[in-house]
Design a protein with these regions (language model features):
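Short, hydrophobic-biased segments on the C-terminal half of alpha helices
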Residues: 54-55
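Alpha-helix C-terminal capping/helix-coil junction sites
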Residues: 22-23, 58, 170
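Beta-hairpin "wing" of winged helix-turn-helix
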Residues: 26-31, 60-68, 74
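N-terminal leader/targeting segments and the immediate start of mature chains
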Residues: 17, 58-59
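Extreme N-terminal segment that seeds HTH/winged-HTH DNA-binding domains in transcriptional regulators
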Residues: 1-45, 93
Length: 237
């Protein structure tokens, strides 16, 4: 543990080592931290000691634990976005449990419409994400999002089932500033109705919007379909 301070308790030495690795970029923002077993072997200590070090990193917001997945490097804007009322925090505040399932991820050309929307070339790539948001295991909304790849190099490497898209944008250097949205009601297709445990033709709340950064650059187009009985939750993505 060459880069540790010897007069500190072992778990604090390890915490400092891991924090320094995060600061240096050895563990990039959004990436998974090695497992407790791997770290215990590396530092020649017990899992309990590693867990104590990780607990401190969680408290400081430098990492986030996700059950069944592991620990991920957090971001300095995390607390701010949670306070802004994101899906995860809004649901947690209600006493329920949120989860996100990634249905599909791909890249596609912008084409004329989205090139004009984002101010990019028609042959520039968009990162397309389709997600299912759940509360206590029950599906409540489907969201389709398009993001210009040239604005967020490496976005496909962030686990967006762990980090919200707004957190991800911050991680990659662009802070969302404002959104222009419109609300409507539409009948669900058979595919979307099946995902939401509804019948084809049932009505859903539709929110479509464009998000901008502080410079006025459009960074995200999103469209979501939400079950009417989930309307008690207010959140943005």
């Amino acid at each position: 543990m060459a880069d540790a301070v010897e007069d500190l308790p072992v778990y604090k030495q390890i915490r400092r080592c891991i924090a320094e690795r995060i600061e240096r970029g050895d563990y990039p923002t959004g990436s998974m931290i090695p497992s407790e077993n791997e770290l215990a072997e590396e530092f020649g200590t017990t899992r309990l000691t590693i867990r104590s070090a990780m607990d401190e990193l969680v408290k400081s917001g430098q990492i986030r634990r996700v059950q069944g997945k592991g620990a991920f490097v957090g971001h300095k804007w995390f607390d701010e976005h949670e306070r802004r009322g994101g899906f995860r925090q809004s649901v947690l505040a209600s006493g329920a449990t949120p989860s996100v399932r990634i249905l599909a991820r791909s890249k596609r050309y912008a084409g004329p419409y989205y090139a004009d929307l984002f101010g990019i070339a028609e042959d520039d790539l968009l990162y397309s994400v389709r997600r299912l948001n759940c509360i206590d295991g029950e599906p409540v909304s489907i969201e389709m999002t398009l993001i210009p790849c040239l604005l967020f190099p490496g976005i496909e490497g962030v686990d967006i089932s762990v980090f919200s898209l707004f957190e991800t944008y911050d991680m990659l250097g662009r802070k969302p500033d404002q959104s222009v949205e419109k609300l409507d009601i539409e009948a669900l297709s058979a595919r979307d109705a099946s995902l939401l445990n509804l019948e084809p033709g049932d009505l859903a709340l539709v929110l479509e919007g464009l998000t901008y950064d502080s410079s006025g650059q459009a960074i995200e187009h999103a469209k979501s379909f939400t079950r009417g009985d989930a309307g008690g939750y207010t959140y943005n993505y």
